């Protein structure tokens, strides 16, 4: 994460990363799963027996802060579980006028910074980034309970 923050500071002076969510203990994941079971929002959660990468400490949710310390508008809010949050649909949403070129530019800066730190983007959440191979993480690392 430090590599991502350093890259951003070098390439976009004044802008910083803001961590919104990181380590999520297994018990919290189970509680979220139970609360959202049977709703469309459950599609955005990892099934607890499989495990969220957050529960292994290998995922982070981040956004950008501008030079004044304000969150940069990304077209949707953090944890807004809608199609407009999906990076995979950005071009389509831009064409429909549901996202702006500025939203995509800001998301692009965030992704570039995170990729320079070795993170991978999730196709359904512009704010979520995984570190490492999910299968290897689940097979070889302990979960925080």
Question: Which role does the model predict for each range below?
Answer:
Residues 1-145:
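Cell-envelope/glycan interface and biosynthesis
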């Amino acid at each position: 994460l430090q590599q991502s923050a350093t890259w951003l500071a070098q390439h976009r002076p004044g802008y910083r990363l803001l961590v919104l969510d990181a380590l999520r203990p297994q018990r919290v994941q189970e509680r979220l799963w139970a609360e959202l079971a049977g709703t469309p929002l459950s599609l955005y959660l990892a099934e607890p027996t499989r495990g969220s990468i957050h529960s292994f400490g290998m995922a982070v949710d981040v956004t950008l802060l501008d030079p004044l310390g304000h969150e940069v508008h990304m077209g949707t809010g953090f944890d807004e579980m809608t199609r407009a949050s999906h990076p995979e649909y950005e071009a389509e949403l831009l064409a429909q006028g549901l996202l702006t070129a500025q939203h995509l530019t800001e998301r692009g800066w965030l992704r570039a910074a995170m990729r320079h730190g070795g993170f991978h983007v999730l196709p359904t959440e512009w704010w979520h980034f995984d570190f490492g191979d999910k299968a290897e993480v689940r097979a070889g690392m302990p979960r925080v309970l």
